[in-house]
């Protein structure tokens, strides 16, 4: 069986709700928002993989040393090429970048774009969103590395968590 897989950082349910509420109040755009249950930050994209590759990914992730990670989100952005409105960290995060690059190297993944941490808010956007309220100001303490499967449904694409590996909690959180 084939699976469309990626590794990412999932938001907790209350964080997804906070982000969805902010998005509904702060952004004006004619295109519908991404399903809030899909909010996540992609670290490594595998594409289509079979069951044996899925098993290998799970095994490697179980053995992987994982860092404590947090991100402060405050930058609204737009990529015209992929027609995506997104929220990005307001400051570079070396630990996050290093971890994503380590995952890509471990799984020998090549991507034509460098790692650019973000949470997609609107897809199929022909133009940027207009900010009509306060800018975003979210600090997220990431709880787990998550292996997701992307599935097409009648309601649109949905991301299903197949496995989670806890991340350590830092001694102190700094934005």
Map each language-model feature to its residues.
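Histidine-dependent nucleotide/RNA phosphoesterase domain, centered on the 2H-phosphoesterase fold
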Residues: 1-175
């Amino acid at each position: 069986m084939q699976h469309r897989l990626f590794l990412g950082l999932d938001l907790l349910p209350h964080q997804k709700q906070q982000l969805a509420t902010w998005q509904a109040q702060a952004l004006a755009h004619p295109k519908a928002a991404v399903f809030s249950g899909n909010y996540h930050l992609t670290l490594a994209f595998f594409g289509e993989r079979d069951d044996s590759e899925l098993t290998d990914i799970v095994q490697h992730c179980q053995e992987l040393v994982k860092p404590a990670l947090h991100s402060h989100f405050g930058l609204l952005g737009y990529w015209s090429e992929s027609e995506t409105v997104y929220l990005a960290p307001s400051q570079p995060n070396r630990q996050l970048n290093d971890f994503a690059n380590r995952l890509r190297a471990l799984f020998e993944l090549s991507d034509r774009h460098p790692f650019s941490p973000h949470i997609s808010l609107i897809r199929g956007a022909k133009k940027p969103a207009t900010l009509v309220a306060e800018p975003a100001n979210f600090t997220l303490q990431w709880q787990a590395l998550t292996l997701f499967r992307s599935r097409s449904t009648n309601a649109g694409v949905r991301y299903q968590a197949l496995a989670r590996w806890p991340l350590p909690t830092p001694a102190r959180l700094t934005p």
